[in-house]
Amino acid sequence: PSTAEIIKGAEKFNMPVIDIGNGDFYQIGYGKQGRCIEAAITSETRCVAVDISCDKLITKKLLDIQNLPVARGQKVSNVLDLLRAADEIGYPVVLKPQFGSKGKGVFVDIRSKKELVKTYDYLKNQFKDIIIEKYHEGDDFRVCIVNNEVVAVSKRIPPFIIGDGLKNIEQLVEEINSAEN
């Protein structure tokens, strides 16, 4: 769940919510009962869990060790590695940063070498570590687990824009992105 959803839930139960970090960091409750949150991370979340959740390769390895299905893929360091991995995995593929969240920098359903190299060149200017994986069509779900219990599941809907006949695409994207913060 997003920070906004957690805050709505707290307010629904008349719990005090204090913005202590420019809309990114909140305290819910007062005194010793108060809890801090940033996105879905709380003051109860262990540091190692946060580190794991931000590193897609470690997350994938841990899921694989538990015999959960993961997409075939690897970290790539240059165009030669990239093309070799794509041939081995098979198209379509996904390119994404190793570290990050909220789907930022993730490009899906890449179907050609030309598109792959173009996307890689774009990503390598923004991110140091890049992963290529096999693309599997289907829905994307986020699961929030608290105290070993699933408390929320959300379906991610890919971003899209509906024009208003007045603004250009860049203006519409900026408007939507600023509204999310």
Regions found by a protein language model. Name each.
Residues 1-22, 41:
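Low-complexity, highly charged intrinsically disordered N-terminal segments
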Residues 22-23, 98:
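Short, ordered loop/turn segments at secondary-structure junctions
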Residues 24-29:
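Short polybasic amphipathic segments
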Residues 35-181:
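Active-site nucleotide/adenylate-binding loops and adjacent lid/helix of ATP-dependent enzymes
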